Amino acid sequence: MSHLQNLLLDTLLGTKHVDSAALIKLQERSLCVASPGFSVMPSDVRTLVNGFAKNPLKTRREGLYFKEKDYKCVRADDYSLYAKNENTGVIVVKTHLYLLVATYSEGMYPSVCVEATEKLGDYLRRKGN
């Protein structure tokens, strides 16, 4: 298991409020690591990368289509996308090299998922990643 995968498992899934997580390489637009059982399809990678490439206001208006679900975007800026669909959601944080993706499901606290994902994103940015 790689250092990056350990980070995902320990800092995100370890909270019990992150259902699944992944790191996407921005330059290659490809999956780097993911939590067990979480697959991110190339179309989903494009959706997330384009969510940052577009004007954040446009992303916020249009929402995201991720993992075969429409999500309402509740935050979109240069570094973060938060989107929800009923009792589930996806949090995406942009670093220099990666998109950090975390999902939460029913019964989990979105605020804990957001906080853990943003903290890991800050850590990766400080490390130059």
Swiss-Prot record:
* GO CC term, one of those recorded: cell cortex
- Which organism is this entry from? Bos taurus
* One BP term from GO: manchette assembly
Protein name, please?
Profilin-4
List locations, semicolon-separated. Answer: Cytoplasm
Cite the SMART domains for this sequence. Answer: PROF (SM00392)
Q: Where does the source fall among the domains of life?
A: Eukaryota
Q: Name one GO molecular function term.
A: actin monomer binding
What's this chain's function?
Involved in male fertility. Required for manchette development and acrosome biogenesis during spermiogenesis. Binds in vitro to phospholipids, including phosphatidylinositol 3-phosphate (PtdIns(3)P), phosphatidylinositol 4,5-bisphosphate (PtdIns(4,5)P2), phosphatidylinositol 4-phosphate (PtdIns(4)P) and phosphatidic acid (PA). Contrary to other profilin family members, does not bind to actin in vitro.
The principal localisation class reads: cytoplasm
**InterPro entries attached here?**
PFN, PFN_euk, PFN_sf
Task: Give the Pfam families listed for this entry.
Answer: Profilin (PF00235)
- Print the keywords alphabetically: Cytoplasm, Developmental protein, Differentiation, Lipid-binding, Spermatogenesis
Kindly indicate whether the keyword Transferase belongs to this entry.
no
The record's similarity note reads: Belongs to the profilin family.
Tell me the organism's taxonomic lineage.
Eukaryota, Metazoa, Chordata, Craniata, Vertebrata
Q: What PANTHER family has UniProt attached to this entry? A: PROFILIN, PROFILIN-4
